Swiss-Prot record:
Stored Pfam families: NUDIX (PF00293)
Designated name of the protein: RNA pyrophosphohydrolase
PROSITE patterns: NUDIX, NUDIX_BOX
GO CC term (a single one): cytoplasm
Length: 159
């Protein structure tokens, strides 16, 4: 599903532990790291997509996490021209994302990247909250900055 402006609706997931660190996932067979994210199907709400993607990409269930916050609006990024599939219709030029800040309330051993036939990640680690800003691919950096900045007060206020 792509909107009239060419952006695919998507959810981004910032999963935190009790130390305030965030889950940072390595894309399969790449030296590229990112937060889990995924598309919203036509019959889903952003929250429905969050739980589906959380299970598909990280192996966690609804009961394993607590939603702390969600971004107020959609945050958009454009894909670099080399990643735009110019022969696909409708044309997708980027993603528009709702970001969710979650707290892991179960044991971290529940995190599994290999529960689907086509896993997106092959590794993960806990990193400091702001660490991803200097590590994520350049075209996603501004969206990460905006999401982390908007959601940071909720992480600090969680206790």
């Amino acid at each position: 599903m792509i909107d009239p402006d060419g952006f695919r609706p998507n959810v981004g997931i910032i999963l935190t532990n009790d130390a305030g660190q965030v889950l940072w996932a390595r894309r399969i067979n790449q030296d590229a790291w990112q937060f889990p994210q995924g598309g919203i199907n036509p019959d889903e709400t952003p929250e429905d997509a969050l739980y589906r993607e959380l299970n598909e990409e990280v192996g966690l269930e609804r009961e394993d996490v607590q939603i702390l916050a969600c971004t107020r609006g959609w945050l958009r990024y454009r894909l670099p021209q080399r990643l735009v599939r110019t022969h696909s219709q409708p044309l997708c030029i980027g993603q528009k994302q709702k970001w969710f800040l979650l707290r892991l309330i179960s044991n971290e051993q529940r995190v599994r990247m290999d529960l689907t036939g086509k896993p997106e990640f092959d590794g993960w680690r806990w990193v400091s909250y702001w660490y991803p800003l200097g590590q994520v691919v350049t075209f996603k950096r501004e969206v990460y900055r905006r999401a982390l900045k908007e959601l940071a007060p909720r992480l600090l206020a969680r206790d």
